[in-house]
């Protein structure tokens, strides 16, 4: 995150106890330590880090991948099996939608040094369904699996609605899992949907999201247009 510092990545002097005496000794940070071992280092939410700090990995991304520690007069050569990965919701372009507040725009010179950039889309519906069922054991029945499959359908409709620009909030697999867990607690699928996802949506868009739910489950929610019209 944005609190990761250069010292965390590169290393710093620390007071250690050796032979009963306190001495100052340099301790490798995350990057030098991982670089020297057969480790896959993953920078999760890479675009949340401060750009000036993330420049530390610039040389590691070069073809040779050597890391120079000038203060220590060391040149660290990467282990043959060392690999560096990163995840970023904005692909380094910065937050233009407001959904990923707190992320940073990554320097394009650094982005250019990543050899492979790929997109990880949502899971296929059967896979997402099986994950939820595996996490919520009470749904591991024929009726439960059918219910979860329909929940995933609602989630997919929010994703398509987001792509089309109809709504500004989207259901992640994590939200579907939370919905299933809350449904187990409250014994009410519609109420669980409202507290798990619908209440997080923009008030002006809730009727659209409630319609997604109605299309799949055939049940009107209090936020539905039809219910509001009857009032």
What are these regions (language model features)?
Residues 124-231:
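Alpha-helical lid/collar subdomain of P-loop NTPases
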Residues 1-149, 153:
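AAA+ P-loop NTPase catalytic core and its hallmark functional loops
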């Amino acid at each position: 995150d944005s609190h990761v510092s250069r010292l965390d990545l590169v290393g710093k002097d620390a007071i250690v106890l050796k032979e009963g005496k306190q001495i100052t000794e340099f301790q490798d940070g995350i990057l030098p330590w991982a670089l020297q071992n057969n480790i896959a280092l993953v920078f999760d939410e890479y675009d949340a880090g401060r750009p000036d700090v993330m420049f530390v990995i610039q040389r590691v991304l070069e073809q040779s991948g050597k890391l120079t520690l000038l203060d220590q007069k060391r040149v660290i050569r990467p282990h043959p099996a060392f690999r560096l990965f990163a995840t970023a919701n904005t692909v380094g372009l910065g937050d233009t939608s407001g959904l990923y507040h707190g992320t940073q725009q990554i320097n394009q010179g650094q982005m250019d040094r990543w050899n492979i950039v790929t997109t990880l889309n949502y899971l296929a519906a059967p896979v997402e369904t099986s994950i939820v069922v595996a996490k919520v054991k009470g749904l591991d029945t024929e009726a439960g699996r059918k219910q979860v499959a329909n929940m995933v359908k609602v989630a997919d409709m929010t994703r398509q609605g987001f792509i089309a620009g109809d709504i500004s909030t989207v259901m992640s697999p994590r939200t579907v899992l939370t919905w299933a867990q809350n449904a187990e607690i409250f014994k009410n699928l519609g109420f669980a949907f409202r507290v798990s996802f619908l209440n997080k949506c923009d008030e002006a868009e809730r009727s659209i999201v409630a319609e997604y739910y109605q299309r799949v489950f055939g049940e009107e929610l209090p936020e539905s247009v039809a219910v509001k019209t009857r009032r």
